[in-house]
Amino acid sequence: MQKIMHISVLLSPVLWGLIFGVSSNSIQIGGLFPRGADQEYSAFRVGMVQFSTSEFRLTPHIDNLEVANSFAVTNAFCSQFSRGVYAIFGFYDKKSVNTITSFCGTLHVSFITPSFPTDGTHPFVIQMRPDLKGALLSLIEYYQWDKFAYLYDSDRGLSTLQAVLDSAAEKKWQVTAINVGNINNDKKDETYRSLFQDLELKKERRVILDCERDKVNDIVDQVITIGKHVKGYHYIIANLGFTDGDLLKIQFGGANVSGFQIVDYDDSLVSKFIERWSTLEEKEYPGAHTATIKYTSALTYDAVQVMTEAFRNLRKQRIEISRRGNAGDCLANPAVPWGQGVEIERALKQVQVEGLSGNIKFDQNGKRINYTINIMELKTNGPRKIGYWSEVDKMVVTLTELPSGNDTSGLENKTVVVTTILESPYVMMKKNHEMLEGNERYEGYCVDLAAEIAKHCGFKYKLTIVGDGKYGARDADTKIWNGMVGELVYGKADIAIAPLTITLVREEVIDFSKPFMSLGISIMIKKPQKSKPGVFSFLDPLAYEIWMCIVFAYIGVSVVLFLVSRFSPYEWHTEEFEDGRETQSSESTNEFGIFNSLWFSLGAFMQQGCDISPRSLSGRIVGGVWWFFTLIIISSYTANLAAFLTVERMVSPIESAEDLSKQTEIAYGTLDSGSTKEFFRRSKIAVFDKMWTYMRSAEPSVFVRTTAEGVARVRKSKGKYAYLLESTMNEYIEQRKPCDTMKVGGNLDSKGYGIATPKGSSLGNAVNLAVLKLNEQGLLDKLKNKWWYDKGECGSGGGDSKEKTSALSLSNVAGVFYILVGGLGLAMLVALIEFCYKSRAEAKRMKVAKNAQNINPSSSQNSQNFATYKEGYNVYGIESVKI
């Protein structure tokens, strides 16, 4: 095989020259392959032929070497760089990884590799192999391992081991880490035998093999040879090629074997490739002509596709890339990086395609993201996919294991008894239930859920209502369970599908599925009456302090305007008038007296203005800043005014559990038997403990027998009773007529409803998988929307509030009319006072003039008196009066 590789390497320039010819569109690609990588090299060549187009050709320059030899890697890398390659594909190990990454970062040459992912950031290194750490940790947690041995190959790096040890320290796992990377081939049989004997003494029956295919095959051979470490043992093969190893030897031995697979043979893209791959000639393409492909070979094929796509994108962007005149010595001092290497690195990282290894996408560090790894188990009929792991969904189990033997026949022939409880909207009696029989009498969320579970698990069922109407709690004296939990514990029912909360004490006696609904304890109170805006609610958009500041600002601005107008010489002016034929000048006047200043400021604030304006610069500055001030204030006021006038707010007496615990006026309680009461009884949090102390000693009792009783108590208490219940039920009742309850504050805890089965029931696993599948399909959310909101009776606003919040009533703006009427009345009163005052003054003046006329009745005096009278009379005439 190695001879074939050597011949292909020596003849590669000739072969590729014949295939592609000499073309200006030829792109030189370097290749560093370890000796013995026959299949990887064949996949590389197939990719070159497959993805080359008429636009350009990828021309490879291949070097076959020992990747563990840093000197050989340095020579090969420098040789590739001096040939003017645009990018290099190749492999590395722990001894050569630093050399390659250093050259790439210094010379700006991109290196695409399917080797193990490195920690940290390495510029110009594109890693095709996804990181396995997250999937491995998820699988360990899925199997609930807390003690296991970890056999690792040092050539693959220690990052995965470090992640396992970090999780072990956090979750208190017992991990025995053993390095099998440096085992001498001559003594490997003896070494492995001694190793497994030590594991047997330590009772380590769970083993993780963090090794590549050849090392895994060696270990499996020794396990079979020894014969003691097969049945009852569980092995996890921690690489991405579960089907690459020779598992036939251990398939029927009784051991549990799990692992990971990056190449999904059920995928249509992989199937088409395998059809072509299996037809290739073994002599021309060593390692081909098989029905499978190693995951490293698949990553090699994908790497060629990534490079091709990157150069195609550069062509589309009309970015010219050339190595002419840039091929130099990589050992030059100082090193001269390739100027256009950054463009190629950017193009490679931006590639997103579908390949043999699934979705191929990279982050800014050149590492794979958004990938999916299949979870595999070895069955008697061969490797089988049981689920998958992704960065978003984490581990998802998709294989449903049906009960075997008599359990299957029993499940198919038996009618499963499903216990539940009458609780809206989970289980309700239909209006015409007297005319119906069996399961048709019921409707609700859990009724629909039971039908879906039965359909997925393949059994017939009968719905029964729990006799005592309780969920399930253990009596403190007799230790007997009641409710639905009791029916499961004492064999009266096979499964409970109801709003049954998953708790620790219940989990000790029954099994729960994954939660089908998440919720928490919440507070229900009677909805307070909506407070209508007050008569003077138009003042609410601004706080009381702001209104006071505005008043002081108004007075201050008026005074400042008055003062600057008095001090500024440019504010004084002389009025001229004609007296016969001559023009006369009166004395200097100033329009901005204190009253005119107040009037000017008021007009500006009301956005109206007045008939006078400042003449001086100082006065205009005062006016300008006042206008700016009023612009912002009025705009802010107007923006908030609509909300304050149209929205009828509900003022809740409490907003949280803290508010409840700090007062005694409003009583509060829970269901007398259930998880909510148990939560407060066991809680060590000060607030909840204080609430429990109150509820336990309150008279009359604040506990209720049913949720319906608790809701009725809330509605009849006129706001003096709060009921603590699950948030889902609270939200449902809030949507039911008479729409007089509401949920306040956030949830007090976080928990979930689960489907319960007796301990060890054959239904448990099937039901759990059915719940997961329904959740993935979005059916659980659809059911909740159907029974909570689609059938709601109060609307989104709760009742008939929509029209009330869209139109203003007279009460909203009554204060404005009051001010208008008050202003008009005040104006008339002031006018009357002015008239009376002026009339009295004129009467006195006329009386004085008349007396003077009687004493000295001269014509001049009469004329003067008449002029005086005329002047006073014209106050109410056309002539203006200056203040």
From Swiss-Prot:
> Which family, according to UniProt?
Belongs to the glutamate-gated ion channel (TC 1.A.10.1) family. GRIA2 subfamily.
Pfam family membership, one: Lig_chan-Glu_bd
The entry annotates sugar attachment on N256, N370, N406, N413
CDD domains in UniProt = PBP1_iGluR_AMPA_GluR2 (cd06389), PBP2_iGluR_AMPA (cd13715)
Its PTM note reads: Palmitoylated. Depalmitoylated upon L-glutamate stimulation. ZDHHC3/GODZ specifically palmitoylates Cys-610, which leads to Golgi retention and decreased cell surface expression. In contrast, Cys-836 palmitoylation does not affect cell surface expression but regulates stimulation-dependent endocytosis.
Q: How does it sit in the membrane?
A: Multi-pass membrane protein
Record-annotated membrane-spanning stretches: 544-564, 617-637, 813-833
Phosphotyrosine found at: Y876
The protein in question is named: Glutamate receptor 2
| UniProt keyword annotations, A-Z | Cell membrane, Disulfide bond, Glycoprotein, Ion channel, Ion transport, Ligand-gated ion channel, Lipoprotein, Membrane, Palmitate, Phosphoprotein, Postsynaptic cell membrane, Receptor, Signal, Synapse, Transmembrane, Transmembrane helix, Transport, Ubl conjugation
Whichever gene encodes this chain, its name is Gria2
Entry's Gene3D superfamilies? Answer: 1.10.287.70, 3.40.50.2300, Periplasmic binding protein-like II
What remark about domains does the record contain? The M4 transmembrane segment mediates tetramerization and is required for cell surface expression.
Provide GO CC annotations from the record: AMPA glutamate receptor complex; dendrite; endoplasmic reticulum; glutamatergic synapse; membrane; neuron projection; perisynaptic space; plasma membrane
Taxonomic path:
Eukaryota, Metazoa, Chordata, Craniata, Vertebrata
Q: Which residues form a coiled coil?
A: none
Q: Where in the cell is it found?
A: Cell membrane; Postsynaptic cell membrane; Postsynaptic density membrane
Membrane-side (Extracellular) residue stretches: 25-543, 638-812
